[in-house]
């Protein structure tokens, strides 16, 4: 059976902890979409001092706040792909320590993976915490549809950049702070589990 790629990232705000998986057919498709996206935004005026940072890593917080047109261009290019964004939320009643957050992350990721009915190769945004990353690897390798799982660097993985931005859209939508209506651009491609 053929497998698909699942890029995973998380986001958090006072009300929610959200884990999102971007399910795509191949790394090549995502990399090509990212390349087209970068070419399409070359004409957008961006101050020189922010351009290097922006073009190195299209962080969602920067795009949400200052570069609506860049974010729209990114989502437009992503929408040309065959993809599905599957996410799971934890409603926070209180803030919790990192150890609890790690357990919640794994539980939400497990929920996402169990919902997907195809084999997946998972690439999750690195945490620079080898103990936590080992816990993720150990837990997820037991899922019958997980072919492989590895951490990835958001500066090197276009899929992680895309899923980072989808995470922020979902966070803004869930908290009713999506003033630019980004969610309307992806709502046909997302599923909450």
How does the language model describe each region?
Residues 1-193:
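Phosphate-ester processing/binding pockets and catalytic centers
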């Amino acid at each position: 059976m053929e497998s698909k790629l699942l890029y995973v990232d998380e986001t958090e705000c006072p009300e929610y902890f959200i884990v999102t998986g971007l399910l795509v057919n191949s790394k090549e498709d995502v990399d090509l979409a990212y390349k087209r996206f970068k070419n399409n935004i070359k004409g957008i005026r961006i101050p020189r001092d922010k351009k290097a940072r922006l073009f190195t890593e299209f962080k969602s917080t920067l795009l949400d706040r200052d570069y609506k047109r860049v974010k729209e261009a990114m989502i437009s290019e992503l929408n040309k792909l065959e993809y599905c964004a599957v996410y799971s939320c934890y409603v926070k009643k209180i803030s919790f320590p990192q150890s609890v957050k790690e357990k919640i992350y794994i539980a939400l990721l497990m929920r996402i993976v169990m919902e997907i009915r195809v084999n997946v190769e998972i690439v999750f945004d690195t945490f620079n915490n080898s103990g936590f990353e080992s816990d993720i690897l150990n837990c997820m390798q037991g899922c019958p549809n997980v072919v492989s799982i590895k951490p990835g660097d958001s500066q090197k993985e276009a899929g992680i950049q895309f899923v980072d931005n989808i995470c922020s859209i979902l966070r803004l939508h869930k908290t009713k702070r999506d003033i630019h209506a980004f969610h309307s651009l992806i709502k046909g491609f997302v599923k909450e589990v």
